Swiss-Prot record:
The keyword Secreted applies. It comes from Homo sapiens. The keyword Ribonucleoprotein does not apply. Mediates docking of ADAM10 to zonula adherens by interacting with PLEKHA7 which is required for PLEKHA7 to interact with the ADAM10-binding protein TSPAN33. Interacts with ATP2B1, ATP2B2, ATP2B3, ATP2B4 and ATP7A. Interacts with PLEKHA7 (via WW domains) at zonula adherens; this interaction is essential for the interaction between PLEKHA7 and the ADAM10-binding protein TSPAN33. Interacts with SLC5A6. GO terms for molecular function: protein-macromolecule adaptor activity. Residues 47-129 form the PDZ domain. This is PDZ domain-containing protein 11. Keywords: Cell junction, Cell membrane, Cytoplasm, Membrane, Secreted. GO terms for cellular component: adherens junction; basolateral plasma membrane; cell-cell junction; cytosol; extracellular region; pore complex; presynapse.
Length: 140
């Protein structure tokens, strides 16, 4: 039995836009050159944990949702908030909150989950490419 997966069954994966290094930087100097950052760890998923006292604000806004087909994104982080100190940033895609998948969720449901939770464990990834595409499509 052939265990290979047909090409059309592979998921579509969107990667951040890649910019080639400037031609004037010699290839052997590109790794550590200050004008070229090839560090991609900023795009890896990470977990943000927040505790919210009753009546307190989260310190960030979201936009998007199922209607945009691109997910929920952080659209604003209030400076010096707990969310800011935890490393949340504009352009982060919210993958899950408290083990609830946020990749195909209605905006209103996402807001409800975030507002009612006292402890929030968010799985996010920095995804500026889809964030900008999502901003162009929605008004949230």
């Amino acid at each position: 039995m052939d265990s290979r997966i047909p090409y059309d069954d592979y998921p579509v994966v969107f990667l951040p836009a890649y910019e080639n290094p400037p031609a004037w930087i010699p290839p052997h100097e590109r790794v550590h050159h200050p004008d070229y950052n090839n560090e991609l760890t900023q795009f890896l998923p990470r977990t943000i944990t927040l505790k919210k006292p009753p009546g307190a604000q989260l310190g960030f806004n979201i936009r998007g949702g199922k209607a945009s087909q691109l997910g929920i994104f952080i659209s604003k982080v209030i400076p010096d908030s707990d969310a800011h100190r935890a490393g949340l940033q504009e352009g982060d895609q919210v993958l899950a909150v408290n083990d609830v998948d946020f990749q195909d969720i209605e905006h209103s449901k996402a807001v409800e989950i975030l507002k009612t939770a006292r402890e929030i464990s968010m799985r996010v990834r920095f995804f500026p490419y889809n964030y900008h595409r999502q901003k162009e499509r929605t008004v949230h």
